[in-house]
Structures are given as structure tokens and as C-alpha cells.
């Protein structure tokens, strides 16, 4: 199970703004009609997904530099997903194939408002079997930002690989970005999910959570600032709470505020948070003074809100990720 050679190593080594994304990539099966159960769905659209991979693709589509570290089944779906990464401009040298496990699948139920529920087929799937010894630490240490979620924390050996990768990044002075991306059906219990997600909380420099995730993690009202600030810790540079179509809230040690969202025709919210994160990481990688400059941060968050909104207007995550031009067009229309 050697790393894939895709010829991107030299380019990544020379790229000062590389974002390395760690975790899972899978196939989402999205129903062709919203508002019905999985059993009632007449057909499904096959779409690549998995939050860390979506973030990597979002970064590349916006002109940034990204790489993905993770494991895939040595099956048609696995090879298809790695090809999709490459076609989207993502460095795939940190990807591995496992001949003994399948690529993960998820069936997505779309509610009439575009919100989702998930049913997963991944026990075990190849992404869960990545080991510490298989990590491409050279790639990780070349990054400016190391980004990850929490799904890779659920089971061994991937949990140990995740922690080792994160610590290698931190020891190299690389910024750590955390989007927990809570998926309760994958955890043994709600308590296990909460404990697992919070177990690495204070390793991050930047954390993005949704309002629903704030409510879950704090067991309180996400609109109550006291609950949000209970997630703050000394050393954190930026905490973002996304509030769906309402936009987002931001917190740093020096300032806080909110940035309104954009009104669009929402079809499927899959990948919206990943488009938001990817677009923000592109800007942080270019200029990390964003953490200390509120005007720059607000401009970046306006752009990220636009990217997240655009992603909800099509089914699937990666196919719906916007370009800079499309995001700027939405911002310009909203200003007029």
C-alpha cells in the first residue's frame, strides 16, 4: 500500500500556501427527489463527498494549493475518488489504497428545505484503517495549514494516525484547522461523540462549528454567547460559528462580531460548510494577519458566506463548489 505517485510533490514543496486536509472521502448517494425517505426514493445521484476532501477541492477550485491525506478501498469507488481529487487539482500523494476494505458509502436523505440526514456504510471502511506508520509526514510538514475533522477520531487505528499527524504539524509550527463535522450515527453514543470531539479541541489554532454543533457540544442554546464562549480557550486564534443562511459569527481574543449571509435557492446543503471553510483557509494561507485584522477578517468571511451559499444551489458537494468569479458575482449582486 505505497503512496500514490502523482507528480505533485515538487509543486507542493515549492508552494508556500499549501493546505493539507486529513480524513475521509466517500461516495454520497443523493436522492433525485427531495422530501422523501430513502425507501421512497426512486433513484440516487452518485456524488463524491467527505468533509476534509470537500475542503481540499474547495481550496483548489478557488485557486489555492491543497493536498489530501487518507485511505481508500482498492475498488472502483476508491480509484474514482482519487481521480476526482486529481482532476480538481488536489495533490494526492498522501492517498493510499487498502485491498482488504471497501470505500465508504453514505445515503443522504434530503428534506424539502435541503437539510440532510445520513445513513452510512463504513464498518469498517478503508479510511478507518489508516495507520500512523502509513502517514506521509513529509507532505504534512510542507503545509502552511493542516485541516481535519472528527470522524477520523472515532476508531483505531485511524484515531492514532490522526493524533500523530496533528502533532507532527504542530511541532513543525503549522497552523491547525478543525471543523468537527459532527455525524452522530457514526459514534457509539452522543457522550462518546462529545468526548471524542473535545479530546483534541485545544490543539487547534482555528475552529469552525455550526450553530447545531455548538448546541450539541455545550448542551445549551447556540444563540447564547456564554455557551459559545465556553468553547474558547487561551491560544485559540479564531472561533467561527456558522448560522446557515443567516451567515456567521466570529470570535478572536481582540474582537467579535457577525457577518450576514446570502439569500439563494437552496437545493442541498451538503458541502456548504466545507465550501465556507475551504474559502476561508485560502485567505488565511495567503495572509494569516486576518486573525488580527477585523476588516480583513470580515471581508474574508463575506466571501466564505457567499461560497457556502452557492454550494447549496446544486446537489452534491464537490460539483457545487464555486469559483472565485461565481462567488464575487453573488457578492456584487447582493450589494446592488
Swiss-Prot record:
Classification via Pfam families: PfkB
The EC number(s) this enzyme carries: 2.7.1.4
Recorded GO MF terms: ATP binding; fructokinase activity
GO BP terms: fructose metabolic process; starch biosynthetic process
Description of how activity is regulated: Strongly inhibited at high fructose concentration.
Functional pathway: Glycan biosynthesis; starch biosynthesis
Enzyme class, spelled out: transferase
Catalytic activity: D-fructose + ATP = D-fructose 6-phosphate + ADP + H(+)
Cellular component GO terms, alphabetical: cytosol
Keywords of this entry: ATP-binding, Carbohydrate metabolism, Kinase, Nucleotide-binding, Transferase
Tissues where this protein is expressed: Predominantly in roots and endosperms and low levels in mature leaves.
Functional note: May play an important role in maintaining the flux of carbon towards starch formation in endosperm. May also be involved in a sugar-sensing pathway.
Family: Belongs to the carbohydrate kinase PfkB family.
Name under which the protein is recorded: Fructokinase-2
The organism of origin for this protein: Oryza sativa subsp. indica (Rice)
Gene: FRK2
Amino acid at each position: 500500500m505505497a503512496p500514490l505517485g502523482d507528480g505533485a510533490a515538487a509543486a507542493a514543496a515549492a508552494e508556500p500556501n499549501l493546505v493539507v486536509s486529513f480524513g475521509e472521502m466517500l461516495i454520497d448517494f443523493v436522492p433525485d427527489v427531495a422530501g422523501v425517505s430513502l425507501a421512497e426514493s426512486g433513484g440516487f445521484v452518485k456524488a463524491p463527498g467527505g468533509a476534509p476532501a470537500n475542503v481540499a477541492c474547495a481550496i483548489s477550485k478557488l485557486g489555492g494549493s491543497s493536498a489530501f491525506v487518507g485511505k481508500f478501498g482498492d475498488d472502483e469507488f476508491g480509484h474514482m475518488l482519487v481521480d476526482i481529487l486529481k482532476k480538481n487539482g488536489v495533490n494526492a500523494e498522501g492517498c493510499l489504497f487498502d485491498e482488504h476494505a471497501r470505500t465508504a458509502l453514505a445515503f443522504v436523505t434530503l428534506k424539502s428545505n435541503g437539510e440532510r440526514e445520513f445513513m452510512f456504510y463504513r464498518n469498517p471502511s478503508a479510511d478507518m484503517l489508516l495507520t500512523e506508520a502509513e502517514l506521509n509526514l513529509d507532505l504534512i510538514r510542507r503545509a502552511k495549514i493542516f485541516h481535519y475533522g472528527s470522524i477520523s477520531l472515532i476508531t483505531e487505528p485511524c484515531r492514532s494516525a490522526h493524533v500523530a499527524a496533528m502533532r507532527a504539524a504542530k511541532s513543525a509550527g503549522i497552523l491547525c484547522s478543525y471543523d468537527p463535522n459532527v455525524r452522530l450515527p457514526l459514534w457509539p453514543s452522543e457522550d462518546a461523540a462529545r468526548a471524542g470531539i473535545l479530546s483534541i479541541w485545544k490543539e487547534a489554532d482555528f475552529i469552525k462549528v455550526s450553530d447545531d454543533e455548538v448546541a450539541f457540544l455545550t448542551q445549551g442554546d447556540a444563540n447564547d454567547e456564554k455557551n459559545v464562549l465556553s468553547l474558547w480557550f487561551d491560544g485559540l486564534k479564531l472561533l467561527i460559528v456558522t448560522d446557515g443562511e443567516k451567515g456567521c459569527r466570529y470570535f478572536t481574543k481582540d474582537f467579535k462580531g457577525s457577518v450576514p449571509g446570502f439569500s439563494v435557492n437552496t437545493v442541498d446543503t451538503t458541502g456548504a460548510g466545507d465550501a465556507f471553510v475551504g474559502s476561508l483557509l485560502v485567505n488565511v494561507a495567503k495572509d494569516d494577519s486576518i486573525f488580527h485584522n477585523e476588516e480583513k477578517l470580515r471581508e474574508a468571511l463575506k466571501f466564505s458566506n457567499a461560497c457556502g451559499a452557492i454550494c447549496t444551489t446544486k446537489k452534491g458537494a464537490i460539483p457545487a463548489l464555486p469559483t472565485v468569479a461565481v462567488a464575487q458575482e453573488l457578492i456584487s449582486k447582493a450589494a446592488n
